[in-house]
Each structure stands twice: as structure tokens, then as C-alpha cells.
A protein has these predicted regions:
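Active-site rim helix/loop that mediates acceptor-substrate recognition in acyltransferases
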Residues: 40-88, 93
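Short hydrophobic/aromatic beta-strand or adjacent loop that forms the aromatic wall/cage
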Residues: 75-79, 178-183
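Conserved beta-strand in the GNAT
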Residues: 81, 86-97, 102, 112-119
Length: 191
């Protein structure tokens, strides 16, 4: 598995805590089996249990679906975890869209990356961990020679991604039963 060479961090205050006691937010590529398991548990909780995607039941009832796919076994894929202090509570995944990337590859996939499976546990969403996770993924892909990254974003998160410098392209498309917007970011100025 490729590993980016830097760690990303930010601070945020927890409700009920003094602003003088910051919550340290960090993002790192998965390095241990325990971190990899935590990455997949968070994805399952958010996408299958909460959102009912990938064959799960919406609203936390059931949730027997599986959000894993062939990219999870790709040695070029980077699985990222986000922590609030020492608690793993967020994830994102990125991988190159090379000429052998199957249906994900376009006619000119060289230098293109895809970011997906961005998830933060509900009880931690108020901390703002999503932005450091996205920035970590963008920076990692850029440092590995990427020139463009794409992601398919749920409509509720389009403004958030635009705020982070992403641009919309095309119309909404269906993905796992929900509408998603294809968005792109130029990686050439991100390192």
C-alpha cells in the first residue's frame, strides 16, 4: 500500500469543554491491522447502518450490507483514518485511476485519482474532521504525482466540497441508490 509522507492535524473545541482545551484532529494513512479494521467499521456504520447503502437498512435497522469493493484490496489504494485526540472516528479512501482501473478509468486516466468513502462517526461530526480528511487525501494524491482527483458527492455535501476548492461537473448521477454529484479538484497546485 502506498503511504503519503506527511501527517495532517488541526484543532477544534468540544462542546462542554473550555476553548483552552482543544481536541487534536489528525489524519494518517492506515498503518496497522487494528487501524484498517477501525477504518472498515466506521465505513460500515456510516454507509450501511446509518444511510442504508450497499444493501443495508436505512435508519440503523439491519445493516447487513457490505461497502467494500475491489479497491479495498488494491495495493495502490490509501486508506486514511482521522482521529480526535486518540480516538479513530473518521475515514477516507483514495486510489489512482490507472489504465487498468476497469470501469473507473476514463480514456486518459494517467495522473487521475479518486477519493471516496469519506465518513465521520455521527458523534464526532461537529468537530470538523471531514475537511482535514479531504485535504489529506488531496495532498497525498498530489504528492504521488496526481494531477486531478474526482469524487462522487452526496448533494448535502456539495457546498462543503466547493468550499474546499472542488468544482462540479455534469449532472447528478445515481450511486448505491442515492443521487451523487461528480466533482473534481486540480492536484497540480496542492503540494
Amino acid at each position: 500500500m502506498a503511504e503519503p509522507s506527511s501527517r495532517s492535524s488541526a484543532t477544534a473545541s468540544l462542546p462542554g469543554r473550555s476553548s483552552q482545551t482543544p481536541q487534536l484532529l489528525t489524519c494518517d494513512a492506515v498503518a496497522t491491522e487494528a487501524e484498517r479494521c477501525a477504518h472498515f467499521r466506521i465505513r460500515h456504520q456510516v454507509f450501511v447502518i446509518e444511510q442504508g447503502l450497499f444493501g443495508g437498512s436505512y435508519g440503523g435497522v439491519g445493516g447487513t450490507g457490505d461497502d467494500t469493493d475491489v479497491h479495498d484490496d488494491d495495493p495502490a489504494a490509501i486508506h486514511v483514518i482521522g482521529r480526535a485526540d486518540e480516538t479513530i472516528c473518521g475515514t477516507v479512501r483514495l486510489y489512482p485511476l490507472g489504465p487498468d482501473a476497469g470501469a473507473d478509468a476514463g480514456p486518459d486516466a494517467g495522473g487521475r485519482w479518486k477519493g471516496d468513502r469519506l465518513a465521520v462517526l455521527a458523534s464526532y461530526r461537529h468537530l470538523g474532521l471531514g475537511a482535514p480528511l479531504v485535504r489529506f487525501a488531496v495532498t497525498a494524491a498530489a504528492r504521488l504525482g496526481g494531477r486531478e482527483m474526482e469524487a462522487f458527492i452526496q448533494p448535502a455535501n456539495i457546498a462543503f466540497f466547493r468550499w474546499l476548492g472542488w468544482r462540479r461537473t455534469g449532472d447528478l448521477v445515481g450511486y448505491a441508490g442515492l443521487p451523487h454529484q461528480r466533482m473534481l479538484i486540480d492536484l497540480t497546485s496542492q503540494t
